[in-house]
Design a protein with these regions (language model features):
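Right-hand nucleic-acid polymerase module
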Residues: 2, 79, 88, 226-230, ...
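Conserved polymerase palm-domain catalytic core
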Residues: 51-52, 105, 120-215, 219-234, ...
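Active-site catalytic microenvironments for nucleophilic, acid-base chemistry
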Residues: 93-97, 197, 201, 238
Length: 302
């Protein structure tokens, strides 16, 4: 595989930092970080460029908080300036390079893919190959983001990149928190990269026809239940080499009996339905919106 260099200057260019600033602020124009940054925007970008060029950039302190929907998770948030701008600047340059390494079977946080593309592909497989999709192997990884090993991730980055200064910067960002922190813009790409060679192994060496991955949520379809059980043993070993552990609730089951619970839907050969939890969340949010609307109307009529 050809390794790519001469990227650091592209990341550090003032034009790229300005573009990153424009991207990072989308949907956040009224937030404190953007408002403060805009008071001295040009000076800040020049300062960021200087710290990158002289090698003195260090990741800022994280603001860590917990969310409870759809499940309890710790979220790590960095300041808008300089960190979020820098992460976008890095991805302006690296996104096409990294995405080129992904197989067509992974869907999380990739432009023109996502949940709907994953759902479409699962439906297509079930419709076009009912015999070859009789059984499903469903698995996910225990505490995937916190379990990502820094040394393994760094070695994966070096399979595609050879720019020493850029790799040094990426190493600093990686080492700024345990695992890969949920909430960082770069984290979703690091997570996809961490499993991209596993994807290639599944498709190119194991010759799995029906394989779908969304983050660490994995679905494999086949006609033979015993084959899927055997493959699961190999998957567990491969992921173990990546310092990852499969959750104990993995299952092999007939699709006709219970459907495939994946990306918010439950898929059968003949139909698809929305997951119950998604329906409940939607109904709760709709009820809140209707309640606000009624209050607003009552206030207006007074």
């Amino acid at each position: 595989m050809k390794r790519i260099g001469n990227l650091y200057e592209k990341v550090c260019s003032i034009e790229n930092l300005q573009l990153a600033d424009e991207k990072a602020r989308k949907g956040k124009l009224r937030t404190y970080g953007v408002i403060e940054h805009d008071k001295k925007r040009e000076v800040n970008l020049l300062k960021l460029r200087e710290t990158l060029l002289n090698g003195t950039f260090h990741t800022s302190k994280y603001d860590v908080f917990t969310i409870y929907e759809p499940k309890e998770r710790e979220i790590y948030r960095l300041p808008y300036f300089p960190d979020r701008i820098l992460h976008h600047a890095i991805m302006n340059v690296l996104e096409p390079i990294w995405v080129s390494t992904f197989t067509a079977d992974t869907y999380s946080c990739i432009k023109n893919r996502g949940i709907h593309a994953a759902a479409k592909k699962v439906k297509q497989a079930l419709r076009e190959d009912p015999e070859g999709t009789t059984f499903c192997l469903k698995l996910d990884i225990r505490k995937f983001y916190p379990s990502i090993n820094h040394d393994v991730l760094k070695s994966i980055l070096r399979r595609k990149l050879k720019d020493k200064r850029l790799l040094c910067l990426l190493d600093e960002i990686i080492d700024s928190a345990d695992g890969v922190p949920i909430g960082n813009y770069l984290s979703q790409y690091f997570a996809n990269l961490y499993l991209t060679y596993f994807d290639h192994w599944i498709k190119e060496q194991k010759r799995v026809k029906h394989y779908f991955r969304y983050a660490d949520d994995i679905v494999i379809l086949a006609s033979d239940k015993s084959y899927l059980h055997s493959l699961m043993g190999e998957i567990r070993a491969y992921l173990g080499d990546l310092k990852l552990e499969v959750k104990g609730n993995w299952q092999v089951f007939p699709v006709a009996a219970r459907g495939i619970d994946f990306v918010g839907y439950v898929f059968f050969h003949t139909h698809t339905r929305m997951r119950k939890g998604i329906k409940k969340t939607f109904c709760r949010r709709l009820a809140k919106l209707n309640k606000r609307k009624r209050r607003s109307e009552e206030h207006t009529s007074e």
